Each structure stands twice: as structure tokens, then as C-alpha cells.
Amino acid sequence: MSYQRVEIPESDIQRQLDICAQLRAHFSAGGRQPLAMVDTYGCQQNEADSEKLRGYLRAMGFDFTQDEFAADVVVMNTCAVREHAETRVFGNVGALTHTKARNPEQIIAVCGCMAQQEHVAEKLKKSYRIVDLVFGPHELWRFPELLRSVCTEHRRVFAIDPADGSVAEGIPQQRDGSVKAWLSIMYGCNNFCTYCIVPYVRGRERSRHPEEIVREARELVAAGYKDITLLGQNVDSYGRDLDEDVDFADLIRSINAIPGDFVIRFMSSHPKDATEKLFRAMAECEKCAHQMHLPVQSGNDRVLHAMNRGYTREKYLAQVALARQYMPDLVLTTDIIVGFPGETDAEFQDTLSLVVTVPGVMMRMMSRSTSPLASAGSSSCSQMATL
């Protein structure tokens, strides 16, 4: 699959900020404080995206509320990884019918990974007439422009860019807390695990330039943040799409060199891409937490191959052993999928035995959800292993 990296020009982001100023005048015309509600579903990357949505809304003059009846603008930032999250979103969107009836001027927006799917956008268009704005992750940087179209043209707006995505710097952020901070270092994924929808909705991997990341980290430390989590679907792939000679271990060392009292964390790593260089950097950088999320998904080689994970059971165990050589106190967490299509009881027992083999690992276990975009989504799970 061909891919061309797209970086949004600074002038385009400035244009969005200029639109924010226009919308500030629009929403304050009634003489009262406008209120917005941003409801976030799913992963930490979605939480980081919601901080940008709130940053834009703050630039438009909004304060924030958790009362949907009081909100002038409601934004649902959605997740498409698991079926349960989609069901919740549709239920909650439907419940907003009552708020829209009470306040017909209320603007309802649905964005995020779920909105990027064509069948979801079509369902929202046909069956949820109360929704005014739908846009995917690739269009987040254009949120002010899209919202202005709803306000001034009095029409529903659907902006689903099928491109692989872009990198946009300079979007304002309204962070959730004052101690812990998310710091996105890259977007998208190139792995195409057969159970996963992320590459289809988030696009291919795009790394931010290291100087932009270090600049943001410095600003966070200066603002008093003590716990900085570096975010990427696969942080171990960081830098591969850049012209610069930099990888994730180099980035950790650069952030570690920032003066101040703070902790560096990151998520998530991929067993096929984590390197000894990374483990060494984690061990040698005093600000880097000895903590790693290393999803195994299965302990059986045939199932791992069917998942397109790119490693074997033996490779995973070797990675864990090497990491613990450098960091005996390593806190390891992992993900396990139970009931992957075609998984037998014997193959499931291989996963159980791996759990016993890796002492001290903390696990998240889930039953697989179907997805119309992931290639395993059309398979039926006739054999469901049980714990």
C-alpha cells in the first residue's frame, strides 16, 4: 500500500484559530456563557484527541459541563475497537433526542474512530437526524471550520477523509489534569493485525518530529506536570517514517535530559519491534518508569500467525527475559484475546501456560469483538475457549 506523509501547514492551523475567534463572537452573541460537553470513549489516544477538541472549544469561548441538557455543543469522541463501545455510543446518541427537543439550537457532533467508518457515518446520517456534525480522526484539526459550517450554513456536515492521515502541530489543548499528561508522539498503525480496525480508521504510522515532542515535553514540565505518558499505537515504530535518524530509544533519552522532577511512561509497545536498545535506554534513564505494556494476545504460534502478530511465543518470552535482565524490577502488563476464531482448547492452554511462565505479569483479558473492517471480522467463532 502506497503512503505519502502529509504535514498540515502552520498557516492552516492559524486559520482554524482565526475561525475560533469568529465562533467566540457567534456563541457569545446571546450574552451568556456558552457551554460544551465532550464525552470520550476508548483509548488514551482518544483522551488526548479530546484535549485538543476542548482546546479548540476553549478558544471559542466555551466553558465545560457534564450536563447534556445545559450544553450548547455536545461532542462524542468515539471508539471502534470493540463492539460494546459502538453500542454504547448509539444508545447515548439516541438519548440526546430529549435534549435536542428541549433545545433545538443544540449542536451534536460525533467524531473519532467509530465515525471514520463509512457504514457508521451512513447510519448516523439516516437514522440519527439529531446529529449535526460527523468527522473522523483525520479531520480533527479542521473542527472549528466544520463547526462553523454547521452554525452559519444551518446544515448537517459529514467529513470523512479516506486518506491515511496527517500530522498537525499547534492545536491548542485543554488538559484534563495538572499532574499527569498525555503526549502523542505518533499516530496510526502499520501492523494490520487481523482482529484490529485501527489502521483502517487511524491511518498509517506518522511520527511527530522529535523537536516538536521535546518542546511539548518541556512545556509540560514547566507547567508542573509530573507524569508524562508518551502515546502511540506502536511506540517502538517511532521515527521510521521520518528523514531523521531517530528511534524511540533516542526520543526517551532526549526527554529524559529535560531538567526537572518528572516521570516518563509510554504505551504501547509491540513484541516484534521492542529492542535491546530500548530496554537499555529505559534502564539508564532515571526518569523512565520501569513499566511496559507488551501485549502478547495469545501464547500459541498458530493463533499468533492467524492474528498477523509477527512474532512467536518463543520470541515474546525472549523479549520479556531480555527486558528483565536490564530491569529486574520491571512491571509488565499485557493483553490477551480469548476466543479468537478457530482457537482450540489446546491452543488456549498454550496461552494459560505462557501466563504461568511469565511471573508477575498483569493481564487484561477480553472476548473478541467482530469488526466489519478487520480481516478476521467475517470469521465466526465456533469454538470459544473459557477461563
What is each stretch, according to the model?
Residues 344-364, 368, 387:
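Structured C-terminal cores of nucleic-acid metabolism proteins
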Residues 1-238, 277, 292, 314-322, ...:
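Proteins enriched for Cys/Gly/acidic motifs involved in redox and nucleic-acid/cofactor modification
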Residues 101-104, 129-130, 260, 286, ...:
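Proline-centered flexible-loop/turn and helix-kink motifs
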Residues 367-371, 375-382, 386:
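Low-acidity, Ser/Thr- and Arg-rich intrinsically disordered low-complexity segments
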Residues 72, 156, 245, 337, ...:
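Detector for intrinsically disordered, low-structure N-terminal pre-sequences
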Residues 108-110, 117-119, 222-348:
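Conserved SAM/AdoMet-binding glycine-rich loop
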